[in-house]
Amino acid sequence: MNTILAQQIASEGGVEAWMIAQQHKSLLRFLTCGSVDDGKSTLIGRLLHDTLQIYEDQLSSLHNDSKRHGTQGEKLDLALLVDGLQAEREQGITIDVAYRYFSTEKRKFIIADTPGHEQYTRNMATGASTCDLAILLIDARKGVLDQTRRHSFISTLLGIKHLVVAINKMDLVDYREETFARIREDYLTFAEQLPGDLDIRFVPLSALEGDNVAAQSANMRWYSGPTLLEVLETVDIQRAVDRQPMRFPVQYVNRPNPDFRGYAGTLASGSVKVGERIKVLPSGVESSVARIVTFDGDKEEVCAGEAITLVLNDDIDISRGDLLLAANETLAPARHAAIDVVWMAEQPLAPGQSYDVKLAGKKTRARIEAICYQIDINNLTQRDVESLPLNGIGLVEMTFDEPLALDIYQQNPVTGGLIFIDRLSNVTVGAGMVRELDERGATPPVEYSAFELELNALVRRHFPHWDARDLLGDKHGAA
């Protein structure tokens, strides 16, 4: 067992008291990104090592692994704490997204270590999609590179507002202040083109030697700012979803017995309380909240991010993929939208193609109408293209098969973010972020044949646990 952890548990008065204290700490999700060999995995290993998060058996194993796979000579290769795949260790690179967890007295952390190679940009986008902060590593010898720009743009595109530019390997440039100042100026010049109001901070460090990671460096007395760990512990994360209206995508209809019917999911934004009037989209039917069931029992009110089951006062037709919002809110369903896309498939994205798309719990089909432009990562300019290649980032116009309740991604990532799924292979081939909604062309009501209506009624009557929707949109429930 970790000796420091044992001391912390003892100081809190036992395991139960320690666990309660952990629950009340704030959580920060962050990722490390940047160009290949900039030291991302080594930095995470250093954070884990210097915050005493490594168990004795892990440390012993690390000594042995460093001798077999290490790239640092006689020193501990801290990157091996994170690079777990055999191919990663053999090549000395990160391929998959690796997640690590640690905590200090002030905060809990979830780290996503993302790959630096261009061909794994899609893995990096996956890691960034759930993070609040990005650490962008820059090799002090190389300065700002294409992958640095690419990862910076993807991070901001995915809604990350806090960027920490960690200028690493300062030991290899003799800890020179002018090197740090030059790279800082270069990055700030580039960052003027990034979207959004960003909080950008700079820390000169050496992940290998531990300078300015968890402790102040004696080699860079010219730097008087906080260490990287101090930045992570004190940064104030303001989540946009906390200030947005209530959105609750239904993930699952929970019906363990005939006397209970609840709608499970994670509250995407805002808050909801018992007695509040809510509206269901797309049907528009209204009801009120009777109970809010959580893992810790019933609650009177919950906020964004909590996993809950809502029980309503009325037995109405609600299925997976429906969206619950406050009754006084208006959210017009849209069939057309402009979507920022990070493309992840070998086959390019081109106009005329159709894909399954998944938005929260909702799955439908969409058609690519046009590729507006592709972003040139080198200078963030827009260029006309006929298709979007693997790892390409651009803006596309799409039409959905049915009207969808969507939000702008920067306002609500859950109800404004979607993934593209290949209809034949069922493989995720792209990620999309809603930029603009186009409510043109009101969709005429769908006309169903007599056979379709009879079959729908039969299914709802004899198989109520399937939660089939009434095609005519009646307000009575399926049960």
Curated annotation (Swiss-Prot):
Residues 34-41 are annotated as: G1. GTP binds at residues 34-41, 113-117, 168-171. The gene is cysN. It is an enzyme of class 2 (transferase). Residues 113-116 are annotated as: G3. Residues 206-208 are annotated as: G5. This is Sulfate adenylyltransferase subunit 1. It comes from Salmonella typhi. Residues 92-96 are annotated as: G2. It catalyses: sulfate + ATP + H(+) = adenosine 5'-phosphosulfate + diphosphate. Residues 168-171 are annotated as: G4. Keywords: ATP-binding, GTP-binding, Nucleotide-binding, Nucleotidyltransferase, Transferase. SUPFAM superfamilies: EF-Tu/eEF-1alpha/eIF2-gamma C-terminal domain (SSF50465), P-loop containing nucleoside triphosphate hydrolases (SSF52540), Translation proteins (SSF50447). With CysD forms the ATP sulfurylase (ATPS) that catalyzes the adenylation of sulfate producing adenosine 5'-phosphosulfate (APS) and diphosphate, the first enzymatic step in sulfur assimilation pathway. APS synthesis involves the formation of a high-energy phosphoric-sulfuric acid anhydride bond driven by GTP hydrolysis by CysN coupled to ATP hydrolysis by CysD. PROSITE patterns: G_TR_1 (PS00301), G_TR_2 (PS51722). The keyword Transit peptide does not apply. Residues 25-239 form the tr-type G domain. Gene3D superfamilies: P-loop containing nucleotide triphosphate hydrolases, Translation factors. One of its GO terms (molecular function) is GTP binding. Pathway: Sulfur metabolism; hydrogen sulfide biosynthesis; sulfite from sulfate: step 1/3. Its EC number is 2.7.7.4. Belongs to the TRAFAC class translation factor GTPase superfamily. Classic translation factor GTPase family. CysN/NodQ subfamily.
